[in-house]
């Protein structure tokens, strides 16, 4: 059975004062429109700390995705204990006085021997991997930008690798 990982509380608490990878679609929408549509107001109010959302719901599909993610982490960690689950990766470059940018990649490996940082974003979905990549491209972009910054802060000779892990829930 998958071990329970206590990262959800940290992810929820970081919603105030920060935009994250899951806000990528919202940021792309704002950039594309050239203004902030009303559909983004609630998330931005949470980010600014002027609105608190108490009812974070979890659907059956979300719970299944978390379970699968934890099982994949268990497999990775059993092969290499350096794997981390959902660490907080906070940008220094894209932080200003009143808002920051961060991500919690599902799995992270910092390989000192090979000088490679690997981020893996895991998606449990009933879509194909191509559709999943297209649906989550904005989140992957933010994780890529933050991953490159994180890697450059470790050292110039280091390389960064972002992977999409896909589990099709249709069987």
Predicted regions and their residues:
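Charged, glycine-rich intrinsically disordered N-terminal tails and low-complexity linkers that flank
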Residues: 1-75, 79
